[in-house]
Amino acid sequence: MSHALMQWLHAPVATVALALLLSTPLRAHAAVEDPFFTALDRYSADDFGGCARLLGELLQRGSRFPDGGELLLVECTAAAGDRSQAMDYVNQLLPSGRLSFDDLLHKDLPGLNALRADPAWPDMRRRVEAAERQRLAQLDAPLRRELLERAARDQAAQHVAIDAGGGDAFKGVAPVAQANADWLKTVIADKGWPTYSMVGRDGAKAAWLIVQHADHDPAFQAEILPLVEEAARAGEADLPDLALLTDRVLLAQGKPQRYGSQFTTAGDGTMALRPTEDMDGLDVRRQAMGLQPLAQYKATLSEAYRKPVR
């Protein structure tokens, strides 16, 4: 995996959803060709123009990008040398709230660095900052802040466990996960599921992370699943998040998972796919939910968890 592609990752390593923004050049082994992940492969190979063309076509067709996809479009376009078009994309995408403010202003990537060095950038930056102020003013700021802080504690505990080799080390995550879930239950009872409109994309992602890691309370996960599904269908949550939570709930109910997102550590230390329905149609289902093909997902997990994956 290239250094540039590793830099692209902005989700925490311990989050299984990190697979959405990681890719390895395994396209020959994929059963389903997905334009977004093909574009990500092009970016990994420094074919910035090819990446920009593919993502630009997806945008024109009104396709729904995985989380971070819009920023990748801006990055590829600017890295390909068309900074004017990249700024046009920024203007077009700002109202959607799907461009990360911090990444746009600070992420160290070749295209974004070139964009920020352009003479037209100061005016663009003022527009970006104004749009961010307007967006934040419409959110439940205290709730968003608490969600982000709790998700950060979850991820810190996950990192400690992964660095310790996993297994029993994950027992240290349990108190954090339980406290977060208990708190989130009170929030949902009072305000409903935290959507993009309520707490922003990062706040909603943090809420999903808390539920995804509440394996001590499968009834809570099952109760939240319809709320996440409703939000995802309304564009207020990510389809990949819905897929991962669906798999978690199905497995807890003793059923095969649907999207092949959940793995277990076998006795030999390798990671193995947990029981999954209709393997022949798996990559088609994954593509429909914005997930990369299974072969690439396995490579992602192997790098993230530092274990062989089969």
In which residue ranges do the predicted regions lie?
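Preference for long, solvent-exposed alpha-helical segments and helix-linker "stalks"
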Residues: L94-G97, K107-M198
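Boundary/linker segments of alpha-helical solenoid repeat arrays
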Residues: S63-G69, S96-K107, L136-Q138, E236-L244
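Bacterial N-terminal signal peptides
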Residues: P12-P25
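Structural register within alpha-helical repeat arrays
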Residues: T38, L72-L73
